[in-house]
Amino acid sequence: MKKPISILFDSYHLYHLPQFEPLIDLLSNDKRFDIYHSTSRDIKDEEYELCSKILKKKPGSFIFSDSEEKRKKVIRNLNLDVFICGWSRYKLEDFVSDKTLVGMIYHGIGVKPSYWLDNNDRLDLRFVEGDYRINQLRENGICLLYTSDAADE
């Protein structure tokens, strides 16, 4: 069997976690993936503790550190195949190597201006749902490519 695909879900904030949980659970049942999770050290202590408590119970390995600088180094040293984030307002390039595929899963309901204003050149993929969100991104100059016919239904 070839080496599993390493994928980290970076729940920078607690509110990113609900978008990640179904994927974490799904991929954890597939031997082709090594699952990792993490959350920022730059958030409030209460939020960090709550998010950490949830992530430690999820399948896979919880990556943590006592500082954000150390967390960056630990994650970067994993030399991940895939890095999934919930927003791009931080230096993604500090967490990943050049070979890492970086994806962002949009969170919440509705469309937020941050979808097209918070662009990070290190993002390779954006996961969105629904024609309305896709059209909003296109209207604001974000180049999109469908990955599923589901958006056309």
Regions found by a protein language model. Name each.
Residues 39-45, 108-109, 131-132:
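Short beta-alpha junction loops
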Residues 146-151:
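Conserved small/polar residues in nucleotide/adenosyl-binding loops
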Residues 1-76:
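N-terminal pre-catalytic "stem/leader" segment of glycosyltransferase-like enzymes
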Residues 18-21, 46-50, 94-96, 115, ...:
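A short acidic (Asp/Glu
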Residues 128-144:
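A short, active-site helix/loop in glycosyltransferases that binds the activated sugar's phosphate group
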